[in-house]
Regions:
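Short acidic, glycine/serine/threonine-rich loops at helix termini
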Residues: 32-36, 62-65, 84-89, 168-173
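Short acidic loop-to-helix transition motifs that present clustered carboxylates
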Residues: 53-60
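Gly/Ser/Thr-enriched, mixed-charge loops and adjacent short helices
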Residues: 1, 86-173
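Gly/Ser/Thr-rich loops at beta-strand to alpha-helix junctions
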Residues: 26-33, 56, 81-82, 162-167
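An N-terminal, well-structured beta->alpha segment
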Residues: 1-40, 44-45, 71, 127-157
Length: 173
């Protein structure tokens, strides 16, 4: 089903002239495997894919889409839903949730995609590159936050990723 959703996404994006997509996953079961399958399918359709090499918080995916000038983002996550669930979420070029029109087009296309239409291994048309967004994301946070004010606060500032994709992310900030 991930490959069908990725193929449908590639078909819809191709109709709009898209060339670049960011793909990431959270810490749920199968995340790396599902993200790799989506990336392979998208790349096999001629897209350049920036693939996260580990779990990524959804806001970082959204940032990366804008930062890289990508046409879309694919996040393998079920967000706030139970841990046993997973999902295929689309982001627009603006970094936010894809429009209802895009979701409807992808859903309609998924219903039409059969096994013979799935493209798997990249055939040289597209490529998969590692996503490198951490440094740029931290630079953006530095510009947006008043770090002097935060440093001057009394007490302790705590970040609890609760076992999610943000675990370990703030350690380098």
């Amino acid at each position: 089903n991930v490959r069908r959703a990725a193929q449908a996404t590639a078909d819809v994006l191709a109709a709009d002239g898209a060339t670049r997509v960011v793909v990431a996953h959270d810490t749920r079961f199968g995340g790396p495997m599902f993200a790799a399958a989506a990336a392979e399918t998208l790349a096999a359709n001629g897209l350049t894919v920036h693939l996260a090499e580990g779990p990524l918080p959804t806001p970082v995916l959204s940032f990366a889409v804008r930062h890289l000038g990508a046409d879309a983002g694919v996040m393998l996550t079920a967000s706030h839903n139970p841990p046993a669930w997973n999902g295929f979420k689309l982001k627009g070029a603006y970094g936010g949730t894809a429009t209802e029109e895009v979701y409807r087009a992808v859903a309609a296309r998924v219903a039409q995609v059969g096994p013979e239409q799935l493209r798997g291994d990249p055939d040289g048309e597209g490529r998969i590159e590692p996503l490198e967004a951490r440094e740029a994301y931290f630079e953006a946070l530095t510009r947006l936050l008043d770090l002097d004010l935060l440093r001057g606060l009394r007490g302790v500032l705590v970040h609890d990723a609760m076992g999610g994709a943000a675990a370990g992310w703030m350690a380098g900030f």
